[in-house]
């Protein structure tokens, strides 16, 4: 019985099992050919349909719709967010100056608080000034490069905040659970190491996200339904496959955020166990009072972030802007008040600073 030969099968077999006369390819050439085939397949998986290719582009600019698209809302919103920005910058700047000018505040806890205040100033400066300009502008545009730059520093400073909060939790753990070894453990070298990690890890994280975002191909629409270039709203404009990007957000991003959060949880569990062993009620109150401000900031910061980012891209809606405002605008503004109102040393330091400024 004669076998039917499929020409396509023969071609594939001949590619790998050619006779000696035609088999001039070495192993490296075969690997190269297979690599080109795999690369072509991967590109085809990431490409949109032929119908949509004509609408693909890398836009020169985006349009930020902001908090409201109604013209009559723009000036009232400007009147609301300008004072918020000024209060945030001035409040955090006063915290920094008070800590630097008072020798009693030259401790690891206040060192990290001063750095947190500096990062909060940078954090809101990345977002609010551009938002204020757009409130008074008719175009509300942001260039492609400016958008990626804003996204980079937003992610970097936001994650730096979380790592600094973790460093402050570790400081409180050592102060309460190991008070006799506090100076030795929380040395200048340890504080600098925690500070370097708090800056380096978030910046590597941001760089990875920006590189992945820059590989995306966008559709004809360049309208971002948000008040700044956040990761999720920009992803929604992409026509190319952003599966890798979305998986990275949900895995690597989760790891970057959960690492400091885990440090905070473990530190406070150890603190709770230690405080419950204190016999006097006054001692328990004193121990908890040193952690109250930090816990309030952690709750505000991580509560809004977990609600916003740990959800699929398809579930992201305009309503999530409220959660974004909490951790991008309100939390940096409230930090100086939270850390100073219930902190006797901080209030005294601020009072001394204000007295010096009046005398000058």
Swiss-Prot record:
Location, primary (coarse class): membrane
Keywords, alphabetical: Cell membrane, Disulfide bond, G-protein coupled receptor, Glycoprotein, Membrane, Olfaction, Receptor, Sensory transduction, Transducer, Transmembrane, Transmembrane helix
Compartment(s) where it occurs, according to its Swiss-Prot or TrEMBL record: Cell membrane
Pfam families reported for this sequence: 7tm_4
Cellular component per GO, a single term: plasma membrane
Glycosylation sites: 55, 315
Membrane topology: Multi-pass membrane protein
Membrane-crossing residue ranges in chain numbering: 76-99, 108-129, 151-170, 190-208, 247-269, 287-309, 322-341
Domain of life the protein comes from: Eukaryota
Disulphide connectivity of cysteines: 147-239
Segments on the Cytoplasmic side according to the record's topology features: 100-107, 171-189, 270-286, 342-360
GO biological process: signal transduction
Extracellular topological domain residue ranges: 1-75, 130-150, 209-246, 310-321
InterPro entries: GPCR_Rhodpsn (IPR000276), GPCR_Rhodpsn_7TM (IPR017452), Olfact_rcpt (IPR000725)
Gene Ontology molecular function: G protein-coupled receptor activity; olfactory receptor activity
PANTHER family assigned to the protein according to its UniProt record, in alphabetical order: OLFACTORY RECEPTOR
Role of this protein: Odorant receptor.
Family under the similarity heading: Belongs to the G-protein coupled receptor 1 family.
Name of protein: Olfactory receptor 1L1
Organism: Homo sapiens (Human)
């Amino acid at each position: 019985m004669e076998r039917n030969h499929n020409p396509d099968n023969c071609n594939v077999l001949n590619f790998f099992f050619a006779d000696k006369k035609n088999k001039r390819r070495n192993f490296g050439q075969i690997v190269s050919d297979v690599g080109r085939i795999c690369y072509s397949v991967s590109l085809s998986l990431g490409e949109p349909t032929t119908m949509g290719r004509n609408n693909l582009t890398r836009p020169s600019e985006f349009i930020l719709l902001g908090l409201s698209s109604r013209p009559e809302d723009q000036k009232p919103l400007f009147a609301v967010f300008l004072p918020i920005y000024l209060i945030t910058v001035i409040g955090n700047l006063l915290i920094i100056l008070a800590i630097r000018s008072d020798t009693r505040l030259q401790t690891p806890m206040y060192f990290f608080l001063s750095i947190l205040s500096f990062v909060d100033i940078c954090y809101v400066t990345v977002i609010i000034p551009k938002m204020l300009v757009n409130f008074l502008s008719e175009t509300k545009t942001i260039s492609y490069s400016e958008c990626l730059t804003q996204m980079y520093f937003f992610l970097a400073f936001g994650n730096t905040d979380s790592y600094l909060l973790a460093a402050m939790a570790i400081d409180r753990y050592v102060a309460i659970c190991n008070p006799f070894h506090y100076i030795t453990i929380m040395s200048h070298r340890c504080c600098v190491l925690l500070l370097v990690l708090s800056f380096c890890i978030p910046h590597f994280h941001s760089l990875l996200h920006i590189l992945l975002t820059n590989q995306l191909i966008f559709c004809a629409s360049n309208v971002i339904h948000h008040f700044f270039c956040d990761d999720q709203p920009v992803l929604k404009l992409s026509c190319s496959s952003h599966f890798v990007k979305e998986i990275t957000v949900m895995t690597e991003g989760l790891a970057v955020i959960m690492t400091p959060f885990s440090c905070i949880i473990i530190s406070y569990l150890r603190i709770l166990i230690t405080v419950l062993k204190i016999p006097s009620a006054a001692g328990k109150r004193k121990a908890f009072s040193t952690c109250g401000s930090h816990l309030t900031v952690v709750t505000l910061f991580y509560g809004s972030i977990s609600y916003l980012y740990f959800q699929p891209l398809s579930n992201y809606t305009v309503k999530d802007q409220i959660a974004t405002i909490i951790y991008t605008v309100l939390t940096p503004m409230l930090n100086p008040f939270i850390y100073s109102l219930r902190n006797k040393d901080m209030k005294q330091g601020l009072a001394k600073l204000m007295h010096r400024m009046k005398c000058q």
